[in-house]
Amino acid sequence: MLIDPNNGSPDYFVIFNYDLPIKHIISKNITLHPYHVKNPIAMTLLRDVMIAEVNFTDDEIPDEYRTGFFHTSQYFSRDQLEIFLACLQISNQPSNEKKNVFNFLEDSNNKPYEILGLYDAFPVGILSNSQPIFPFEDSTIDTVVNSSFYQFGTPFLYPISPTHISNSIEFYKKVQSILNKKNTKNEKETSWLLQNILLTYYKSKIDYTLVSISNSMEIIESMFGAPANITMSIRERVPKYLGYGSEKLSKILRTMYAIRSVNDHLKYTHQFSSNPWLHNFYDNKRFISSLTTILIEKWVDEIFNGKTRKEFRTSIIDDEKYSKK
């Protein structure tokens, strides 16, 4: 049901890939809401995203909506929508990103982001001067948005869903739990290691060029050892750890190492575009984002469950030649 049967209030609906054909099937049952950002130019980064309020029940959805309008969209509750809008805000304020991500790691109570304004109904294609239903003001939101942004990056490689937000909250809680454990020397070292890895991961999220590949490889190496002597080992150990096909992931990791050594951006672009297997499996941005996300989340789980860095690194080495490296 798109309408809560208890109070009749609508869910909000985030529409991705909003385009001209969609405008022709908007009806009185769907209300579009523009969201407000400080930098109008940045809106072009998200020009294919629109917020809608859906005012009919699931069994009333016409076929033309099911095949087009709803196919590339996600349902959000009011609370989830606020987090989503805050993620949009972070992606539209790149000048503040690095400063605020440091604040987030240093102070679990830091709340640096304002709630985005979501405006009332407006005719399709016409801007409105109506009053906002979410005020754009100096109030702030919880730092869970920061942890969400760690997972999504900017610009978004994938549409954010309510499930992503829920997972980010759990991820945030685990990270904070690890960072707050400082009773022993090992726990303190683990806390700092986690902080450094998250910052490197963050940098790889906001820059998906050659710099991103370098940052992503730094993350992998910090988890598995020093780069000088484990390059070949990583190619086997990472696929084994992730449970994927060793041959495919090893091939990708070899390519990533090769690309990182290339200083010429044009040559870097050519290497990726001229590799048909890589092009068909993942484009470079999506693969780097996916691989580092999976690795970071698994690593956080291991440490959260009490495993030390040394135990983490040695537990997945079941080949004698790698254990000697």
Residue ranges of model-derived segments:
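Short, solvent-exposed segments of well-ordered alpha helices
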Residues: K188, K203-L210, E247-R254, H279-D283
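Extended, amphipathic alpha-helical scaffolds
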Residues: E218-G225, R237-K240, S261-V262, F304-K325
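Histidine-centered, metal-coordinating catalytic motifs and their short helical/loop contexts
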Residues: E247-P276
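Acidic, Ser/Thr/Gly/Pro-rich intrinsically disordered interaction regions
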Residues: I160-F171, Y268-R286, S290
